[in-house]
Amino acid sequence: EWKELIQFSKKLKIKFYVDVFGLKGIQDISKLKIDGVKIHSTDLNNPKLLKFATKLKIPILLSTAGCTLSEIDYAVTTLSKNELILMHSFQGYPTEIKDLNLKRILALKEKFALPIGLMDHVSGDSKLSMIVPLLGIGLGVEIIEKHITLDRSKKGLDYFSALNPNEFLLLVALIKKSQLAMGKQSFELGKNELQYRILHKKNA
């Protein structure tokens, strides 16, 4: 079943990441041709799992939800030779807005100088479920984790923070536009800015 899903994702040109729990989980997925793995925050101080993870040649996402700075530092140090992305989150379903603490993204970037991602578990039926990921883009995250379900009204497994397919497509489009809007830090003027200067700039 895993191999079929991986092959299907490759046909669609979608990267295939796996969320693992425990040593056996990461040992099992190491035999698969996947694009990356996420280590759950409950395993961030699992020395056997982390030692095994050092052998992986794929990107590793580290969930930092509910972890202290020293725990994150331990995992980052252990996996210092791996390609790491730190994932900020609050491990609650659904996450209350007051618990999001998005500014911690900036603290993680400053402390570890690594790419940062955001795992968003805000209630799927809240308008903020579309806004929080965009705030993450504004804070410089490079990966967004968002759950999807075929029909949230059926209240199946993991429906709390999941989006319906049409909502998910809309969010992807909004994320792409937000990334475009972020632009560059350069002060080099673009075509439209130059045109504005020609038409409206006043000189003494």
Give the location of each predicted region.
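Catalytic cores and adjacent flexible loops of soluble metabolic enzymes
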Residues: E1-A204
